[in-house]
Amino acid sequence: AQFYNVSKARIYGAEVSTNGVCTFNPNTTLSYNLGYVFIEPEDAGYKKKNEEEAAYDDPMHMKEKSNTSKYLKYRQKHTVKAVLDFQWKRLTLGTNIVWKSKTLAVDYLMVDERAKEQPEIMDYVRDILFGNVNGQTLHSYWAKNNTPYCVVDLRAGVKITKELSFQFMVNNLFNKEYSTRPMLVSAPRT
């Protein structure tokens, strides 16, 4: 497999965030950090690259990415994050919430999202490399699971003394299965 550098990448976007602390009384506070990120991760040379790849006559010649879109590989357009911490006397309760939109493109070696009338040689190569169990392939897994996702972490703590405190944390509270790239399934609840 040969991998290519993108000759003309353009990534632009916007980020908005706010943070603060709400003090309800001397013993009770809520701190927050909220944010949103939008990016438009473009390969400015994608049209030329797609034309070159369409002209390939060697069925084993590698394409660069999983689809013909203008987007760079392994990027999501939207991310929303929230960190909230509530403190009452010696007790704390907090959460991290992250929502991300689907991944826009991945490596062609892993997945081919292009529409086609019949399988290509690379589809069989992928089955050999990554497996095909009862019709479940890396491609079918990716097609089903490359969706927007939200992950929630939860933490609780108690301050025993000035120097001693205990914290309990649950990552991925709802045990959401998500994948940011093929063959990299997220960690389950911990």
Specify the residue positions occupied by each region the protein language model found.
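Transmembrane beta-barrel architecture of outer membranes
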Residues: 77-81, 151, 190
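C-terminal beta-signal and adjacent terminal beta-strands/loops
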Residues: 99-125, 129-136, 147-149, 157-190
